[in-house]
Amino acid sequence: ALSGFAQQQPMYGQYMFNMLNVNPAYAGNRDVGNVNLLIRRQWLGIDGAPATGSVSYDQRIKDKNFSFGGQMYYDNVFIQKRSGVQGFYSYSAGMGNSTLSLGMSFGVMNYNANYGRTNAFQAGDPALQKVVNAFLPTAGFGALWSGEKWYLGLSSPNLFKSYKSEVNGKSVSMAGKEGHYYITGGYIFSLSDQVVAKPSIMVKSVSGAPVQYDLNMNVWFGERIGVGASYRTGDAIVGIAELQLNPQLRIGYAFEQKIKVVNTTSHELLMRYEFGGLLGKKILSPRYY
């Protein structure tokens, strides 16, 4: 059998903008209904470079400790295309001045790989000219412990290491996704009445790869403008800019440069719209995570 490429969880320069992408316990954390849009293009100028996009919605159920959400996404890398839908559910409980949330996600992913686009394998094998198409279940779990000025999260957005070996009914290829595990944390420092600093960290572990750290620092001015930078160990540096246009709408942009490879920049655009004011629910402002 031919072993295909194990799928990796997409990378996000602005994961702290919407942690629902890495932790299902984040569903409902903002208390109001909100839509998040992400578009990411990596390594511009390289054929088959990664392209990622998603749109998600989550909200807390009124006067309850339950929250729900959903997401549609795609993630394309060279010959591989991945798209799917997910549902999120979380439960929150007060713990003094803090809140503990536990969340789950369930979904289905379509994996498609066109081996006819690559010549990296043995020529002349008709199986390698086929298109692999598989539908795979996905499930995730997460915990989020947070206070007014801090948060700490532990999650695995993909618990299944699920494989399907099928090309026209023949067991010649595998489509899978390795389990990822994340630890996230952040704290908010008030530097003045108008300036707030938010350092944060994400630790990522995946089978077969070294542990990776994302070290981030964002600074907000007057609750309207945010700028920041990130360093992903052994991989990239990231510049971040965010703008709170009004109580409902925030946009963010990230520019990423690989450390070891020149001319491999990435661009990431995010947008969040909150429906609190329209639904009679107060939007939490300021809210930095």
Outline where the language-model segments fall.
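C-terminal segment of classical bacterial N-terminal signal peptides
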Residues: 1-5
